[in-house]
Design a protein with these regions (language model features):
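Carbohydrate-interacting regions of secretory-pathway proteins
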Residues: 1-169
Length: 170
């Protein structure tokens, strides 16, 4: 399939309906405040990556994870659960996610080395790139061989990683 072919516009939403490849912004951003609404189907795995750029020869970016935590048996604070900074830091275990099939509101704030993830009006994750906490978590992550990970100006990406996902009000 051609890039973007499995994404459609339906009821004012961008919807991933079949394997399609990721969707990227044309512009690149380093400092931004990005809000969006999303919902997923049971078992779905998706995400919003940001500061997507070439990091040591691979196109990567930090990810605000969107996933069916229960179906995948992720604890709420897991580094793989919804709202986590995927593979680096889990979101608050007290996060309030709406049931599968209902829209959630998320926000990503990136300013310099400061990153925040929000879910349904509550800040659920905060980290400073370069801090002691960052160095400890980054050193044990799959991104440990990329010392400048998450620091570059880059594109925002809607991830195609399996399952039907809706995005609106981006």
């Amino acid at each position: 399939s051609k890039p973007g072919e499995g994404w459609i516009v339906e009821d004012e939403c961008i919807v991933r309906v079949q394997r399609a490849g990721h969707l990227y912004t044309k512009a690149s951003f380093k400092d931004f405040d990005f809000s969006f609404e999303w919902k997923i189907t049971p078992g779905c795995n998706s995400g919003v990556k940001y500061r997507v750029a070439d990091y040591s020869g691979e196109v990567l970016g930090p990810e605000y994870q969107l996933v069916d935590d229960a179906k995948r048996k992720y604890s709420p604070g897991s580094k793989s659960a919804t709202s986590s900074l995927y593979a680096i830091k889990g979101a608050s275990a007290k996060k309030k996610m709406k049931p599968i099939g209902e829209f959630n509101h998320s926000r990503i704030l990136a300013k310099g080395n400061h990153l925040e993830h929000w879910l349904n009006g509550e800040k659920v994750l905060q980290i400073e790139i370069g801090s002691k906490e960052w160095h400890e978590l980054h050193a044990t992550s799959k991104f440990k061989t990329r010392p400048n990970f998450a620091t570059k100006k880059g594109r925002i990406m809607l991830q195609d990683h399996g399952g039907k996902v809706w995005f609106r009000n981006l």
